[in-house]
Swiss-Prot record:
This is General transcription and DNA repair factor IIH subunit TFB2. It is found in: Nucleus. NCBIfam families: tfb2. Belongs to the TFB2 family. It comes from the Eukaryota. GO terms for molecular function: ATPase activator activity; double-stranded DNA binding; RNA polymerase II general transcription initiation factor activity. Component of the general transcription and DNA repair factor IIH (TFIIH) core complex, which is involved in general and transcription-coupled nucleotide excision repair (NER) of damaged DNA and, when complexed to TFIIK, in RNA transcription by RNA polymerase II. In NER, TFIIH acts by opening DNA around the lesion to allow the excision of the damaged oligonucleotide and its replacement by a new DNA fragment. In transcription, TFIIH has an essential role in transcription initiation. One of its GO terms (cellular component) is nucleotide-excision repair factor 3 complex. It holds the Pfam family Tfb2. Its main location: nucleus. Component of the 7-subunit TFIIH core complex composed of XPB/SSL2, XPD/RAD3, SSL1, TFB1, TFB2, TFB4 and TFB5, which is active in NER. The core complex associates with the 3-subunit CTD-kinase module TFIIK composed of CCL1, KIN28 and TFB3 to form the 10-subunit holoenzyme (holo-TFIIH) active in transcription. One of its GO terms (biological process) is nucleotide-excision repair. PANTHER family: GENERAL TRANSCRIPTION FACTOR IIH SUBUNIT 4, TFIIH, POLYPEPTIDE 4.
């Protein structure tokens, strides 16, 4: 899920809550600031234009500010603001006038001007009142450990420490993981693998959206839940904040947010918490690396004043070796794969659908095989997801060669409609064929009966198995039959009775 798609999901959730709840939300300046950041660019422009104007404005006047080729964006901006009840429409003498929601306007003004914010941005604790100051390095290590513990668990990496019970329940509730029948173990689902392909900010919000839905079933106040989430995104990393103004619901949330690595608390002083860099990503447009571990490293090791987009780095095909993204891989037409990574998490993700053979200091080598793809398919990963993962992590050199090849085709035939093929077509086609092969074949657990003395014995047992609904397959010529696991005991008992009767 791209961050634009994620914004749509968050906005959609906010649109679906009752207007009375929305009005309560808008009493928090921090929440208003976060919602403003989620709006389309044109909607932000309109809000900043009218925020200090208490008079009603004609919708036609706003329309005049937009060029003819931007009418679609204009409609989307107005629609998004109306659905969130940020605009209050009125009709005067047949003319449609609009103005900002008064509650939102007052809170957003206070957020911009530093007015009365009612501690919605947290209560900072002076360092003089702290026994020890927690530095950024500790917070970064804590956040990385907590978050990657969740990701490692999802890909099945053997770990000394499991995620908390709350995290496991959320993974199960969000259908990212499912329990293996007759076992206490969990396995990743189709949605879970797609989750691993997302950027870290998208991953965090995907979990928190499920947390919001789970909170509803637990009768937690949605206003307190949302206010706390948006507040975390507005806090300053490295500062200590007091729990003094938090509600009972938010204090409970604080314990859950610790499990996700969004906040840090010292056991010796539970009245103080520290937001981590992961919490900053809740209201940030900054895009992270495509890989899970690479994203963590990028966000946690990035200086506060670093504003360079990582997309610029990835879009540049010419670069130094150290500029190549962690996990960039090369695939040959013989299905051999080379991935430039040394992250245990990245290697664990690859092992879900690649047979890894060798590991070096900064690279792993393996091969995509029928068995490795079948294992991934059985675990709920689709062929399209595997292909999408390989394409998104393709080495820049592979992308450049693919673009050069497509450019030559366009020079010969300007009407060429061929897509950009980053991966070898043989690899893509074969992965899809392996999925079709698995879709055609159904597997059943049961027992095979062979070596019948006579055709009469075979037909008799075959008829009995068919009558009780246990017969799955038979071969009259070779005198073989296959019965289900559930019906095998009955068929076996029947066969023993007939053999005993025959011997008598």
């Amino acid at each position: 899920m791209s961050f634009s798609g994620l914004k749509h999901s968050i906005t959609q959730y906010l649109e679906e809550i009752p207007s009375q709840v929305q009005t309560r939300l808008y009493k928090s300046p921090a929440t208003c600031l976060a919602i403003y950041r989620l709006l389309p660019t044109l909607a932000k422009f309109f809000i900043m234009t009218v925020i200090f104007n208490d008079k009603d404005i004609s919708l036609r006047d706003l329309d005049r500010w937009v060029k003819s080729n931007g009418k679609l964006q204009f409609q989307e901006a107005i629609k998004s603001m109306k659905s969130l009840h940020l605009l209050i429409p009125t009709r005067v003498n047949g003319q449609l006038l609009i103005n900002l929601n008064p509650t939102f306007r007052e809170s957003f003004r206070n957020a911009l001007t530093g007015g009365e914010v009612n501690n919605s941005f947290g209560i900072v604790v002076d360092e003089d009142r702290l026994d020890t100051v927690v530095n950024l390095a500790v917070l970064d290590e804590y956040a990385a450990t907590k978050w990657e513990t969740i990701l490692h668990f999802m890909v099945g990496t053997p770990m000394a420490k499991m995620p908390s019970e709350n995290v496991l329940n959320l993974l199960k509730h969000s259908k990212l993981m499912e329990e293996v029948p007759d076992s206490s173990e969990f396995m990743i689902t189709n949605e879970g693998f797609q989750f691993l392909l997302q950027e870290v900010n998208s991953q965090i919000w995907s979990l928190l959206l499920q947390y919001l839905k789970l909170a509803e079933s637990l009768h937690m106040d949605p206003v307190h839940v949302l206010n706390f989430i948006f507040m975390l995104g507005a806090l300053e990393t490295g500062k200590a904040y007091s729990t003094e103004n938090l509600s009972e619901t938010q204090l409970k949330m604080l314990l859950d947010m610790r499990d996700y690595g969004l906040v840090f608390q010292k056991t010796s002083n539970p009245n103080i918490f520290y937001p981590t860099r992961l919490a900053q990503m809740l209201t940030s447009d900054t895009k992270s690396m495509r890989t899970a571990s690479g994203a963590m490293e990028s966000v946690l090791n990035k200086p506060d004043d670093a504003a360079k987009s990582t997309d610029d780095k990835y879009d540049s095909l010419e670069g130094k070796a150290e500029d190549i993204q962690d996990g960039a891989l090369i695939i040959e037409t013989n299905f051999k794969l080379y991935s430039y990574c040394n992250s245990p998490l990245q290697i664990a993700i690859l092992s879900l659908f690649v047979h890894l053979k060798s590991r070096f200091a900064n690279m792993v080598a393996g091969q995509i095989t029928r068995e490795s793809i079948r294992r991934a398919l059985i675990n709920g990963i689709t062929a399209d997801q595997v292909i999408a993962y390989l394409e998104s992590h393709a080495h820049p050199q592979m992308r450049r060669l693919a673009e050069e090849k497509l450019q030559k085709k366009l020079e010969l035939d300007p009407n060429c409609k061929d897509p950009l093929q980053v991966l070898p077509p043989t690899v893509v086609d074969q992965i899809k064929l392996w999925q079709l092969e698995l879709d055609r074949v159904l597997t059943y657990e049961g027992s095979l009966y062979i070596d019948f003395d006579t055709a009469q014995d075979f037909n008799m047992l075959c008829k009995y198995a068919q009558d009780i609904g246990a017969l799955l397959w038979k071969d009259d010529r070779k005198r073989k039959l296959f019965v289900s696991r559930e019906g095998n005991a009955q068929v076996l008992e029947y066969a023993k009775r007939k053999i005993k009767k025959k011997e008598e």
